[in-house]
Amino acid sequence: MARSLKKGPFVADHLLSKVEALNARGERQVIKTWSRASTILPQMIGHTIAVHNGRQHVPVYVTEQMVGHKLGEFAPTRTFRSHTKGDKKARY
């Protein structure tokens, strides 16, 4: 179920204040965050946000196509190690 339009998108307050401060100064810095549930807003375009994936911070460069998505979508939490290739001893 989608979030109500009257509430607006969720963005962590500390993240939004850091982005607005960098925009006011005209700087581009990596912003570390643990807030995977925050929605990407147009103010964040051009910034690099390091999103925590449970083990480390994954740098995510925000582009125009990402607006409206959540930060956690771009920092995968699971690493896929491929299926075993050459184990044929169980076959006859």
Curated annotation (Swiss-Prot):
Keywords: Ribonucleoprotein, Ribosomal protein, RNA-binding, rRNA-binding. Coiled coil: none annotated. GO terms for biological process: ribosomal small subunit assembly; translation. The keyword rRNA-binding applies. The keyword RNA-binding applies. One of its GO terms (molecular function) is rRNA binding. PROSITE patterns: RIBOSOMAL_S19. One of its GO terms (cellular component) is small ribosomal subunit. Gene3D superfamilies: 30s Ribosomal Protein S19, Chain A. InterPro entries: Ribosomal_uS19, Ribosomal_uS19_bac-type, Ribosomal_uS19_CS, Ribosomal_uS19_SF. Protein S19 forms a complex with S13 that binds strongly to the 16S ribosomal RNA. Belongs to the universal ribosomal protein uS19 family. This is Small ribosomal subunit protein uS19. The gene is rpsS.
